[in-house]
Amino acid sequence: MQVIKRDGRRQKFDKEKIYNAVSKAFIEVDKELTEQDKKKALEIADYIESLNKNLKVEEVQDIVEDKLMASNRKDVARCYIRYRYLRGLVRESNTTDKTIFELLNGTNEYWNSENANKNAKVVTVQRDYIAGITSTDITRRFLLPKDIVKAHDAGIIHFHDADYFAQNALHNCELINLEDMLQNGTMINNILIEKPHRFLTAATIATQIITAVTSSSYGGATITLTALAPFVRSSYNKYYDKYKKRGMDDETCKKYAMEDTKKEIEDGVQTFNYQVNSMTNTNGQSPFLSVCMYLGETEEYKEELALIIEEFLKQRILGLKNEKGVYITQAFPKLLYVLEEDNIKEDSKYYYLTELAAKCTAKRLVPDYISEKIMKECKIDANGNGQCYPCMGCRSFLTPYLDKNGKPKYYGRFNQGVVTISLPDVALSSKKDMDEFWKIFDERLELCHRALQIRHERLAHAISDIAPILWQHGALARLEKGESIHELLHNGYSTISLGYAGLYECVKYMTGNSHTDNGVGKEFALEVMKKLNDKCAEWKKAEKIDYSVYGTPIESTTYKFAKCLRNRFGIIEGITDRDYITNSYHVPVFEKIDPFTKLALESEFQKLSPGGAISYIECADLTNNVDAVIEVIKFIYDHIMYAELNTKSDYCQVCGYDGEIKIVDEDGKLDWKCPNCGNMDHSKMNVARRTCGYIGTNFFNQGRTDEIRNRYVHLDNHKID
């Protein structure tokens, strides 16, 4: 017999707790506990035990109340009811003190692994977390309905980023309109930033814009290097004129001007990398930034763009130095390299950039790859034209959109937020009854729908003044002061995401098969995905809000979902017996499958995640096998829209070992250990792993660490036939 607590956890029934609670009510009234009182308390406790079934806490308390009211001690019943009411008030009151002190004193491991790119020991991060704790408390007590809070706590759904929800102007992620801001000027902290006249200045201003923009949102941001390309030409022209004035001939002027321009690009990219990785935004972290490298975005400045891309890749291969002065893998920016006809074929003009990208991926985990070819098949606009554009941050994709003039527009658009459904919970709640599954599925989706509507309405009250750099000065719009952002939330300009997690566990429980079986498992998985999309289409049509299906990364939520499933359903082999659940539609990390089969299979599901998705393969050390990386890249171009290769990039600061730092089980806790010297001090090692699309460098919670440990290596260090 178990008692189900308010947060969904289960505890073995303890009769003594009932006896003690009733006894306290008797003592409160009688000032003592008589033998008759003891007898009555024991009688109630025995009765509840005799029911021999799982009960919710509220059900247990209701029984106690009923039994006392049915007795001749209604005064004790009233005392118990009053006590229960007061306890409820305490639960509803501000309960942040304990959480904040745990953070400040470092007594709760949760904060050290809540985000793989945040160090909870640093005061700027602590300040952000304290603000987040307060926001979450306000959100839970005042802004969300009780049933949504309960569903979130029980792991039935996940209401993302409640720690930023109290403010009504914070959205999720965006494609920053850097071109507009650099060409037409912008304002930062009431200072006018005019159009720069050289690449180095433009690159520096870009980092200031990035920091300001990401301080006014909570998700990832993306810029394109295309916005910087015109300033390379400006710099070149300045250098050319300088040498021309010295009386040099045309060829000499061109030669020296190009040398100086390349040196400026090198300096500008280095400054950009230092700034992005050293500056801290108001979220207490480096900006979660992605940088798009897409030659197809410009014809006029394609040569200049190629020079910038080349330098970004070269410097990323080199890395940034740690405190020991050793070059290591940096987390940001994430690099998004678009594969196209101009760079994918060995005889194409820019194939050398793809070779450089492959070397970079083998050593530093980035760039990730977007196939222009496949994306244009997936993203069709209202004119019937295929479109290619980057994701916002790590994986969130906008839907195709045409402006008033019928032209495609992507930069300057954003995502309003995410609510995720736990698909394994739907499956387990149905007890393998397919009719019941679809009934619960629809109910849970409506719960998500209501939560998403609340997100939308929270933003709908915002005016442009609340984040001028976003709404007035070009990052997302150029609205007037005091103007509502309401129009930007409708008719496809921005998206709002219905996330999903654990498709594999859901399918495995309901069918007994993985969705890789090319049979009943895959058919059911595709049906689930199609119904998610059907719901989004239904909501979108009714409300003119761009709902979109999103493959949620669940970086730390994977652990929460796994624990909640065990609390609600116990340990079920192959479903709830791990400390994580599988991301989105992914093949489970432990399943043995070759890289090409995995990518081909997942491409089918990626098309059904239009609001965001990314696939990956896990690789061994490929620094000496770049040819294998090239073959995978070519496969990505022909078969899947967006994918990445996970390699390892570690360094032990104690002994200098730069191979893979291993995960070990130390007394039931997973930890990291240098296989060379045994060092386990996190502060004396650098570990870089992909956790949710981004590279994590600050270690991970137990669930995510377990997932990393179980990853099957799809591509070993051997030649691909």
How would you name each of these model-derived features?
Residues 293, 496-509, 530, 690:
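Contiguous, well-ordered alpha-helical segments that form the cores/surfaces of helical PPI scaffolds
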Residues 45-50, 68, 524-538, 710-721:
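Short, mixed-charge aromatic SLiMs
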Residues 17, 21, 63, 307-312, ...:
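Alpha-helical scaffold elements adjacent to nucleotide-binding pockets in ATP/GTP-utilizing enzyme cores
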Residues 265-269, 273, 508-509, 704-710:
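Metallocofactor- and cofactor-centric catalytic cores in central/energy metabolism, strongly enriched
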